[in-house]
A protein has these predicted regions:
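Interfacial segments of transmembrane alpha-helices in multi-pass membrane proteins
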Residues: 29-43, 237, 241-258, 262-263, ...
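Cytosolic juxtamembrane regions of multi-pass inner-membrane proteins
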Residues: 392-433, 479-486, 687-744, 790-805
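Pore- and gate-forming transmembrane helices of large, multi-pass membrane proteins
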Residues: 109, 322-340, 393, 413-449, ...
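Small-residue-enriched core segments of transmembrane alpha-helices in multipass membrane transport
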Residues: 45-56, 355-376, 387-394, 455-470, ...
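Extracytoplasmic
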Residues: 205-319, 326-327, 331-332, 556-621, ...
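Transmembrane helices with small-residue packing motifs
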Residues: 29-38, 46, 50-76, 80-92, ...
Length: 818
């Protein structure tokens, strides 16, 4: 009998059970915010907390099955795919491959295998006719499904059936069958296809059809394909594009209902050839006969991403992690150390309230890991570092609440009243800052490539977990403490005293400093050119040494040997295993390939060993070198730029609605400033931009806008309630949030700094950029964003106070959902 936890986890794999559980929790969530009765709100919140935590825990259990590591952590499988030429429909001759064919095949593979961005995979063009695909470790059934999906061309064609092919000859056999057996000559412009089917007792039979060589419609005319259940079986429903619908009408308008037929051909096989029942046909039809819903889903996925050229898996290998075990362990421990230091700081600074915050952070972590397990995400080291960072940043919401709580207690309010007031006043800042990040995440998912989609889902899970743990979890815990009289009073350290700094008067100096830094960054990019981009962006060469079954080299040995060589770009080393033995591969810049190969032959005897053949010396272990494409090409950069631009536009629109256009402009310029400087300064200090930096930049963008919104929220509050000069009120608001700004930045910088120092080279690039972004983001929120708001409002001659009052949403609109 299965253990209860395993049984419960297996039950939750059922979609209906998961849907009902989610629906129940949603009802509780809405009920929690709808009720005003404190005791009821406390009880509903408790049930909701326990339910969501239980759901996440069961999604994670057992961790070894549900928390899957990426290529960098656990290695995986490597497939070498041969891209075959397609056949000309008229001449039936192979069409030579082009670079565009290889590019299309690679893009299609990425969309098929990683449509949601939840898998850590690598796909690069190799040579002139191959694609190298690497994926994290998979179960045998998953590997078999991936292989089938990779080689399924899903080339859909609709062809007119020549009815003469069914006319029987003197021997009683139809014309199409006699052509197939060679007893009749071919009919020009037509080709014989075999259609397989099963009779009533399950015996497989064949019939032959004479079809037009030219396809009336192809997969390019498919707008949408999805699995559909039908009585007695499964099918794939297809919607055609407008152009495809026009072709279908042109094909069928002159047909005779009840007589003429159309054949649906998939990958050269006739799936069905129904008799047309009415004319003309329109946009939608079905392909029937799939044996299971999963088969129908796989076919629909392939048809939405059809290959122009057939693929063949010519080699499969097991690959080592791109990071060694010691490096992975080092990175993990550094992250845990950073979080522990943050936890100790929160406990010392906020004391009893710090315990409540830590409980909220533990729930936050559980929700993030549970969400990742539910979406079947693979965990990379950078992803884990990003989650550690997001948990560290989740401290921000607690700091916001506690700094408000400090103010309310200082104003002489009772503890219960002070707690309620603190949550009420901090809510708008938490809501606005998280919602702007959520807008960005949605747009990134909608517009981005698979890698960007993965980041967007991770960001969304982190945002929702952070809001839930800060607003609901800690609030419920405080309610229990109050109702059970466990909490008599709260005290905090007060290391950051109230200040009266005139930040806005220093804006001109800040503009000069930022201008010089931007100029230096742009200059560094211009001077270094392509050298500022890593292999992920530029592509390069793949150097391979086939060691065979008797010889071996470890990944750390090769990496250590390459550490002492001067190269233009950092190489990426992997050790792969196949039935022919070990293979050492190095992805490097094209100009570094020969230098790296020579250095390795001089460093390892097994690579430098020679033998004499026909009077000539040759290496026992030969090397092969061939070009590989960028893992992040121009399309990725264009998609990312468009997604980021739309995300900025979404933020601009939201801040304009919630605040005023002056605030939107200030936030936009500060965000752009932070992203440009973070990337530019990394290049300026000699770094190379790679895939890991893309995630870092997106994280910085989210942190930056979050920091800015918190200050904007306090400025808005001051303008609504305070009298006096606008500039003075803005300075007071910035000073009021200074303790929160410093505390949040400090805790996050400590966490990331420890990862940078002790996390090893694997995490150095990621954490250094994050550190730069944190410092710049904190600086710009105070010295760039707010001064731009004041400058723009003064430039157009309006009253910022009146504009805020007119354009802000009514507080009751937000209060209603608390």
């Amino acid at each position: 009998m299965l253990p209860p936890t395993v049984l419960a986890a297996s039950v939750l794999k059922d979609p209906l059970t998961l849907f009902l559980a989610g629906l129940s929790l949603l009802v509780l969530f809405l009920w929690y915010f709808a009720t005003d009765y404190e005791a009821r709100k406390r009880n509903i919140g408790t049930v909701l907390l326990v339910g969501i935590c239980a759901l996440c825990a069961l999604a994670i259990y057992p961790p070894k099955d549900n928390l899957k590591g990426g290529i960098d952590l656990v290695g995986g499988s490597s497939f070498t795919l041969l891209v075959k030429p397609k056949i000309d429909e008229v001449t039936l001759q192979p069409i030579p491959l082009t670079k565009d064919d290889l590019k299309q095949a690679r893009a299609t593979i990425e969309k098929r295998v990683n449509a949601y961005g939840n898998i850590d995979m690598l796909a690069v063009e190799q040579g002139t006719d191959k694609i190298l695909l690497q994926m994290p470790g998979m179960a045998p059934e998953e590997s078999a499904a991936i292989k089938e999906l990779l080689q399924k061309v899903a080339r859909l064609e609709l062809k007119e059936v020549n009815l003469e092919g069914g006319v029987p000859g003197s021997d009683g056999r139809p014309l199409a069958e006699r052509i197939h057996t060679g007893d009749e000559p071919r009919v020009p412009g037509f080709k014989v296809y075999e259609q397989k089917y099963k009779n009533e007792d399950g015996t497989e039979l064949s019939t032959y059809l004479l079809l037009n060589n030219r396809s009336a419609l192809t997969g390019k005319d498919v707008q949408q394909a999805w699995p559909d259940s039908m009585a007695g079986g499964h099918s794939v429903s297809i919607n055609l594009t407008n152009a495809g619908a026009d072709k279908m009408i042109a094909l069928t308008k002159d047909m005779t209902p009840g007589r003429d037929r159309i054949a649906v051909v998939l990958d050269g096989e006739v799936i069905t050839a129904p008799v047309v029942q009415s004319v003309p046909l329109g946009k939608r039809f079905q392909i029937e006969g799939q044996d299971s819903q999963e088969e129908a889903r796989s076919l629909a996925n392939a048809m939405m991403n059809p290959l122009e050229n057939p693929l063949e898996i010519i080699e499969e290998r097991t690959i080592s992690p791109t990071l060694g075990a010691a490096v992975v362990k080092q990175g993990m421990w550094s992250g845990i150390m950073g979080l522990c230091i943050t936890a100790v700081f929160v406990l010392i600074y906020y004391r009893t309230a710090g315990l409540v915050a830590l409980f909220g952070l533990l729930v936050n972590g559980l929700l993030i890991f549970g969400g990742m397990a539910m979406f079947n995400f693979t965990f990379t080291l950078a992803g884990i570092a990003g989650m550690i960072l997001s948990i560290g940043m989740a401290v921000d919401a607690n700091v916001l609440i506690y700094e408000r709580l400090r103010e309310e207690i200082a104003a002489g309010k009772s503890l219960k009243t002070a707690i309620n007031a603190a949550y009420e006043k901090a809510f708008t800042a938490i809501f606005d800052s998280n919602l702007t990040s959520l807008i960005t995440a949605v747009i990134l998912y909608w517009m981005g490539s698979s890698s960007i989609k993965g980041f967007a889902i991770t960001l969304t899970i982190g945002i929702l977990a952070s809001m839930f743990s800060a607003i609901l979890v800690t609030r419920v815990l405080f309610r229990w403490c109050n109702d059970l009289n466990l909490l008599k009073k709260l005290s905090f350290l007060d290391l950051i005293k109230a200040s009266k700094i005139d930040f806005l008067s220093k804006s001109k100096l800040a503009y000069v400093i930022s201008g010089l830094l931007v100029a230096a960054s742009v200059g560094a990019v211009a001077m270094r050119g392509e050298n500022s981009m890593g292999i992920d962006f530029t592509g390069g060469s793949l150097v391979e040494f086939q060691l065979g079954e008797e010889k071996s080299l470890s990944q750390p040995e090769v990496e250590k040997a390459l550490a002492g060589i001067q190269v233009s770009k950092r190489p990426i080393v992997q050790v792969e295993k196949s039935i022919t033995g070990e293979l050492v591969t190095i992805r490097c810049a094209t100009g570094d390939a020969d230098k790296i190969a020579a250095h390795l032959r001089g460093s390892f005897d097994i690579l430098g060993e020679k033998e004499t053949e026909d009077g000539k010396d040759r290496y026992v272990i030969e090397q092969s070198t061939q070009g590989v494409s960028a893992t992040l090409g121009k399309d990725f950069l264009i998609d990312s730029a468009i997604a980021l631009a739309l995300g900025l536009l979404g933020i601009l629109t939201y801040i304009t609605i919630r605040f005023e256009f002056s605030f939107a402009l200030g936030g936009f310029i500060a965000l752009l400033h932070d992203v440009v400087l973070s990337a530019g300064l990394v290049i300026l200090i000699g770094g190379e931009l790679s895939l890991i930096h893309v995630g870092a930049l997106l994280t910085i963008a989210g942190y930056s806008i979050n920091d800015t919104i918190v200050i904007f929220d306090r400025i808005r509050e001051s303008l609504k309630s305070g009298e006096g000069d606008v500039k003075e009120l803005m300075n007071e608001a910035i000073n009021a949030t200074l303790s929160r700004t410093i505390l949040t930045s400090l805790t996050t910088i400590v966490t990331v700094g420890i990862i940078a120092i002790f996390g090893g080279s694997a995490l150095k690039d990621f954490s250094v950029m994050i550190l730069i972004g944190l410092v710049i983001g904190t600086y710009s929120s105070v010295f760039i964003a707010s001064p731009v708001v004041l400058w723009w409002s003064q430039r157009k001659g309006g009253s910022l106070r009146k504009e805020v009052l007119h354009t802000s949403l009514a507080e009751s609109d937000i209060q209603a959902i608390r």
